[in-house]
Amino acid sequence: LVRSRGLGDVYKRQHQTVRKGELSTIMKLVFDKADLVKSVGIAMKAVSGKTTMPILECILIDASSNVIKFTSNDMELGIETIVTGMILERGIVALDAKIFSEIVRKLPDNQVTIETDENLVTTITCEKAKFNIPGQSGEDFSYLPILETSDCVSISQFTLKELIRQTIFSIAANENN
């Protein structure tokens, strides 16, 4: 799930002492733009449009383990997707989904680096483009429940499409029907 795509020694980070006034990087990730756009698009489907809880307008980027996960939750629907990328420094940050999505979609087709400092300011870099956006702590984010996968049903894609095709006539054309 996590791959390096030949970045190898270019991104190996040596521990450096941080001078007074400088911020250290607490998370650093590298993605291919296409993988990032696809994953952000999936996560955006569960981002709340209007809410009294600002954290629900965010996508949680969790690179605290060996995989990178994007999670969004509107308290009715939750989505967690695993993103292909390289973890250079582990960390967690919640970013405003709308701003993050707009930035990612407009970046050049190249490698994208996402870095977050100790103040949760996140820098998104791709070629000459560089954006700084404020992040939020992932502690306030509403995590999805862990589901037991022992009770599952598997059907083929063809069967599912056929079931939908045979029943789609019964849905209402609008809310009033």
Report the location of each language-model feature:
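Structural preference for solvent-exposed beta-strand-turn elements
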Residues: 15-177
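Single conserved hydrophobic/aromatic residue that forms the stacking wall/gate
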Residues: 1-14
